């Protein structure tokens, strides 16, 4: 179960689901933040909107962390979810397309510590060179 969750948050190929993702996330945010006291709910909702907009340095950093965490967790489980789901390097790189833009240092660290070792041991499928 946990490894399936790691797969879903790290590089799910569900293209159909992505089409409705923003709407589903908005509905979930409205529901969840609506459960909180009004002032607290508004503050957290505004932070979520800031995160989604990716305009501030803080939002960009939060996005980098959001993208790196699944790689760290997959690496910590010896690539279990990547192996179970036959994850390709291209899926991971697509999920992290803005990570390098926002922090080349952290993306390079992720390549060295999480991606390359799992490519080397076959836990991530290397895409064919075209």
Identify what each model region corresponds to.
Residues 1-130:
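Alpha-helical, largely C-terminal catalytic domains
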């Amino acid at each position: 179960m946990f490894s399936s969750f790691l797969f879903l948050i790290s590089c799910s190929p569900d293209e159909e689901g992505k089409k409705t993702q923003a709407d589903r996330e908005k509905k979930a945010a409205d529901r969840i933040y609506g459960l909180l006291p009004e002032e607290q709910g508004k503050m957290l909702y505004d932070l979520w909107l800031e995160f989604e907009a990716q305009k501030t340095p803080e939002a960009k950093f939060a996005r980098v962390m959001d993208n790196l965490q699944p790689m760290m967790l997959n690496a910590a489980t010896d690539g279990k979810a990547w192996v179970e789901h036959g994850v390709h390097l291209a899926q991971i790189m697509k999920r992290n397309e803005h990570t390098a833009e926002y922090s080349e240092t952290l993306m390079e660290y992720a390549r060295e510590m999480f991606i390359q070792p799992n490519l080397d041991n076959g836990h991530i499928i290397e895409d064919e060179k075209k």
